[in-house]
Amino acid sequence: MLSQLSYTPNLALQQLQYNMTMPSPNLEHQLEKMQRDWDQRARENARYYVNTACSDWSDEEFFRSGERTVAEEVLTDMINICQGIEPRQMRVLEIGCGAGRVTRALAQLFGEVVGVDISTEMVRQAALALADLPHAHVFQNNGKDLTVLGDRTFDFAFSSIVFQHIPSREIVENYVREVHRLLRPGALFKFQVQGDATLSTSPEDTWLGAPFSEEQAVQMAERCGFEPRYRHGAGSQYFWLWFFKR
């Protein structure tokens, strides 16, 4: 069941305090480690590390699993996502495209799909997998921003089982802020984060990422210019958030 997130309209003081906070000194190290670890995982078995349900995915099964994700998280939510726009007229952004599992399924539905990933090897494999889809594009980003996408504007952004691996809430928030910059006004960023704070995490761990509480999610939305309208799965690994650009 979806429920609405409450938020405080004016967080000017909190915004000022946040802006005055210097980035954590190990941020660059974490980003480098994320890229290095995910490149290694991609070379070892990209599809397994994208979806650990199987260690020997066939092409058909792997991309069908992406279709299931889209069926469960996108097709059931088209009113919030499309907002009256025809899907084939929409440009969609996927954060953490991996080997193109979900990207391909999104491209079957929307007019243009752009995926980004921090891993060079994941992006290489995704580009090969999507070569037959001229309206699907993938780029490697640096983990700090989305300047690689230039001045494109997007109608919807999506991310599934990606942020749950990021060891720093600061890095996740940088992504959220950059997505806000690229979305049209009113558009939705639907994404999932790690919500289970009972799990032991480490800044060096690029598999089990930093958890978010409901309060932390709301505060992040407000700092980044979003309305945090809905949430589902708080306290679990699959904590879904619906952020609408103000």
Range-by-range predicted roles:
Residues R124, S160-Q164, R177:
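Internal, well-ordered alpha-helical scaffold/interface segments
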Residues T147-A157:
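A short acidic, Gly/Pro-enriched loop at the edge of an enzyme's catalytic core
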